From Swiss-Prot:
Native source organism of the sequence: Penicillium polonicum
Protein name, per record: Transcription factor verF
Database matches in SUPFAM superfamilies: beta-beta-alpha zinc fingers, Zn2/Cys6 DNA-binding domain
InterPro entries: Transcription_factor_dom_fun, VerF-like, Zn2-C6_fun-type_DNA-bd_sf, Zn2Cys6_DnaBD, Znf_C2H2_sf, Znf_C2H2_type
Zinc finger map (C2H2-type): 19-41, 47-69
Protein's UniProt keywords contain DNA-binding: yes
DNA-binding region, residue range(s): 83-109
GO biological process, one term: DNA-templated transcription
Location of this chain's protein in the cell: Nucleus
PANTHER family reported in the protein's UniProt record: MIP31509P, TRANSCRIPTION FACTOR WITH C2H2 AND ZN(2)-CYS(6) DNA BINDING DOMAIN (EUROFUNG)-RELATED
Keywords per UniProt: DNA-binding, Metal-binding, Nucleus, Repeat, Transcription, Transcription regulation, Zinc, Zinc-finger
Amino acid composition bias (Polar residues), ranges on this chain: 120-129
Spans annotated as Disordered: 120-151
Record flagged with keyword Transcription: yes
Amino acid sequence: MSTEYPLVGSPETSEYPKYECSLCLKRYKRREHLFRHIGSHTSQRPYQCNSCDGAFQRADVLKRHLRTCDGGASRASTRRRACDRCVRQKKACSSHQPCHSCAKKGAQCLYSTDTGYSSRLSQHSSTNHTPKDQELSTQFTNPPPPPSTSTFNTMMPWGLTMEDLQNFGTSPTNTFFDPASMQYTSPTLPDFSVLPFEGPATFETPVSSDPPRKSLHFLDKFTSNTGLVSSFDCGTHEQREQIAARLDQQILSELQQRIMSMPALGMDIPSPLIMENNSDTSSTSDLPLDWFNDPLSLKTHEILLLVEEVVTIKPRNSSVALDWSSTLRDACLQFFSPSNIRRFLGFYWAIWHPNVNFVHRPTFDMLAAKPTLLAAMALIGACVSPDMPDNEDARTWFNCVEEMVFIDDDFNSDLTYQYSGNIAIQRRKIQAVQAAYIVCLYQNWEGADASKSRIRRYRFATLVSTARDIGITAARHLNYSELGRHEFEWKEYEAREELIRLFTWIFLLDSAFVIFNNLPPRMVIKEIRMHMATPEACFQATTADECHHQLHLFLPARTLYWTTSFRGSFESLCKDDLSVNIRHLLATLGPLNLFALTSAIHSQIFQFRSAVGSFQLRAPIQNALSNWRDIWQLFSSTFPQGITPHMTIEDPHIQPEELWKRMGFFRYAPEYWLLAHLMADRLAVLGTSKPENELEPLDEGPLDPILNRYDQTSMRQVNDLIMGFQTFQI
């Protein structure tokens, strides 16, 4: 019999314990209570006393112990004199690491109740004793350190070198793990509970058969708030809490499975201490056992080395203000731990990905991904997490990840693509640009004002230049509808589509700076001679067969798509006699491309506002506005809301596994169209008025008839404009 749980937001939710232990089925109201309880099912004791060798499972027990600790009384009673294997076999143990018996048999030698004893003993003997009250405060306020090593800059786990680490993960055959453990490389979305329907949102959903409604509720909220969650389409806090609960349950279940499977894998994976007998035992004795069976631990170490590099070797005027220390190293390992990477990427896919969808979810592999991209995606996931500590911890690493992304060799290389070449083999370059774009996102919406200005004025300009170096015209598809299934290369399609969407989103961010910060555009429409993005059904297909089928269905061989560029589509949109075929094509391509077209209209309006006496632009802008409205209505009537991939976060029928497929904030494209329409109308009225004087006096009058201040970090003047439109014209 299935158990019915109350929906989030119902009266009984606040009293119902919703977090369940998968081992003993006990329930808890708070997630941290469940985490504390899970520790009772293991032998790990992460809270350690620096004065003696005492180790505890809970911080409050350590706190009570420190009040009475005399600095060594418990050492003799807590130290294990025999390894686990010798204890089980009831044999004498030499107490070495590894002991003589385990070394002779080639078995894994573990001392489960005295993890890291030699490390703590050496630290205790070389460190002066601090006053007890100070030690109590320090040990209790700081969380238990994650696995740390003093030799990360020269030695990797399993005796790997940096060269081995850089080559790891580039091929499915280049792995040290049992195939069964590879199930964690590209996990599916967790089994989220069905999100509750909270009723209509405060704004009307634009995807409907009606004309675009005259309201700017979303843009009003967008320009009056800061932060990714407050600005974009990330669901309610209750919905994100449910996602977090399911992610935690899945990660805990996987962790327990790995721990339980370790005895069976112990004979297959030698102990790192056996493989490296000459290494410092303190560097690996503190590593949790599940890390040695977790392929993502390599990515954690890669990120750690990159962070250490940008912190210790700061360039001039570096934005990184941190100093490298063992505490910072431990904090980095804890934030980018394998379990946190999985959790943060779970938030990225379910909450954030629909808003900026240029990473191909079905083929994304965490092990093969660049560490810079993985770190940037993890930061976005932490920013949209419902847990405040995740949000605060993410800000610590904003500037570090920004620095390591923009100094990355792949990002700064001079590589250019050939249109006829194999773009799929240049995935590292594409991922480097994706990482740079994600950095621009989280810094512009979550960073400090100085970070926002730096991104807008310098980093984004570098990103646009890198896109031009790659070649915007290289972002084109082959005519897949002319290819048979045996000729269709899914990876090649995915790489080209990622590049097209990446350049599209770069243009959209450029347009956002134009609209909301009144910054002159860095990209011009005439240079965007690339294909438009294929429909979402093609990009979201989970198999090569399904993708090939969707391409044939939406984009037949004779359709205009294969011969039309983004520039050509916009030029056609500005004509007064737009053909029916082009209308149907643009409606078929979906909301992302329509959002890009309405953003292009804003770019033209900025040029119109900034030009002197160029009123000939008024007619093309009016044509584009009229044609876009008709195409959006055609799209809304052809692809009704509630059908994949045109579902929204408010849809009551959305399935948990389809959260990443929903439409993001670009479903509010009609509001962008309405803002452009109102601005064009105001410019038309202002254009008919004649100046009072032939020569305008020096330092008098506004710089611009609509927005007076250029390159403004705050969106206040745009919000004032929107409020004025809603008050006087709607």
